[in-house]
Amino acid sequence: MKKMLAALLSALTLLTCGIFSDCTAEKRQPDTDAVWETLSEAYIYAFPLVLTDATKTLSTNTDGSMAGRAPVNQFNHAKKLADASFRTVVTPNVDTVYSQAWLDIGAEPLVYVLPETDRFCNVQILDAWTNTAAVLDKAGVYAIALPDWEGELPDGVTRVNVPTASVWSIARVVLSGDEDLPHVYAIQEQMQLLPLSAYGQEERYTVPQGRYVKENDFVPVNKVLSMTPGEFFNTANTLMQANPPADADRELLEKLSAIRVGAGMTFDDSLLGEDAAERWAQMLQGLRATLSADSAKYAQKLGQWRYYGKPIGDFGTAYTYRAMVALVGLGANTVDVAIYPKTAVDETGAALRGEKTYTLHFASLPPTRAGGFWSVTAYGADDFLIDNPIHRYCINDRSAFELNEDGTLDLVLSRNAPENTANWLPVSDGGFHLFLRIYVPDMEALDAWQPPVIREQQEI
C-alpha cells in the first residue's frame, strides 16, 4: 500500500510540475512563461463561449419594449432589411430577414414551430460554443432538447438534440425587396416558440416578462476584451457547467486544469506573475493577428475571391479557427448552407477605389442547389452599406438586371450612375469591397465554376 501511495504522489507531482519550476514540498514557484503559453491556449479555447454569452446578455436585455431585442425563449423578429443608416453589425446581410431567439433548454425542451413557406427559410441552431447543432429547413414542429433529457414527446414533434443548455436560433427568410416584406411578416406570425410543458395549451401560456439592466447595455466583443483574466476565465468556468465542452476537448482540458480553467473551477490568477496586467494587454492586442495567421489555412480561393471553408460552423477541435470566426463573424453558417466569398481587389490585384469604374463580369451565374440564391453586396471601408441615391445595396438573383446576349452578366461598379442603371451597383468615394454570398451552394459545381472577374474600365 505504501508503494502504491508513493507512486501516486510521484505521478501527481509530475503532472502538476508541468508548468511549475522549483517544485518542492515547501513552495512551488510558477514558471510564468509556461503558464502564459497555456493561458493563451485557454483564452482562444474559451473565447467563443464567453463572447456568445455576452451577446446573449445584450440581446435579451429588455423588458420587451425594445426593438432588436427579446427576452430569453422569445422571438426577436426583424421588420426590415438593413440600409446605409444601419450601424449595429458590420457587413450586414440584405438578402434575408432574421428571426432570432436565445433559448434556455436546461429545465425542459423548447418547442419550435416552423410554418410552410414558399421560399428559402431555414433555422440555424447553434450551441453555446458556436457550433451548428442542427439546421431546420422543413416545416414542422421541433423540440430543442439536451441529449440527456428523458421525457416523451407528443406525436408529430421531432426531437433535435443540442449539447448545451444555452442555444441560439437564427431563422433566415429570403425576400425580394421591401415590397415583399408583408409576406415575410406572415411567416413570422406563424412561427411559434414555447416550453414543451405549454405545448398544446398555448391559450394558457403567458410569455414571461423580460428585465432591462442598464449595466448590460454594452458592445459584446468590447465587453469580453475588457475583462481581466479572473473575470474572463471564471466566467468561462461557470458557463462550462451548463454548457459542457465536447468529449473531443478532453485532452486540452486536462492541460488547462493546471491553471484552474475548467467547469466549476476557480481560476488562480496568482500564477500569472507580477507583470500580469501588461502581458495580458499584450496578448489581447495581438489576438486578431494571431487568429488570422493561424486560420489562414482554412481560407479557400475562388479566383480573386476568398472565403472561409470547412470546418466553419462545425469546428471540432479547430479552436483557433473557431475563435477567429467568432471574432469576425459570430454565428457563421456551415458551407452547405452558405459561403461568403469576399474581394477588395480587381483582376490585377489593385485595391478597389470608388474614383474608378469597374465591370464585374460573370461568365455564368453562381451554382446553387434547389432553393439556393446569390447576391453581390458592396461595403465601404468602414464595413457598412454605402449610401446612394437609388438606395441599392446589392444586386441578386431576384434583381431586374439585364443579361448579355450570350447569357453572361456584366455589373457596373461606380460612384456615379451610368446611363442604364439596371446593372449598376453603387460604390463609395474611397475604398470598398464586395461580398458574393451564395446560399445553398452546389459545392461540386463550384470547383469547375469560373468566378466573376473585376476589370477596371478604361477611359476612351
Model-identified regions with their sequence ranges:
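Bacterial N-terminal signal peptides that target proteins for export
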Residues: 1-8
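Intrinsic disorder/low-complexity segments
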Residues: 7, 17-21, 449
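A periodicity- and composition-biased signal for non-globular, repetitive helical segments
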Residues: 8-9, 443
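Bacterial Sec-dependent signal peptides at the C-terminal "C-region" and cleavage site
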Residues: 12-29
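A compositional/structural signature for long, glycine/proline-rich flexible linkers
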Residues: 26-460
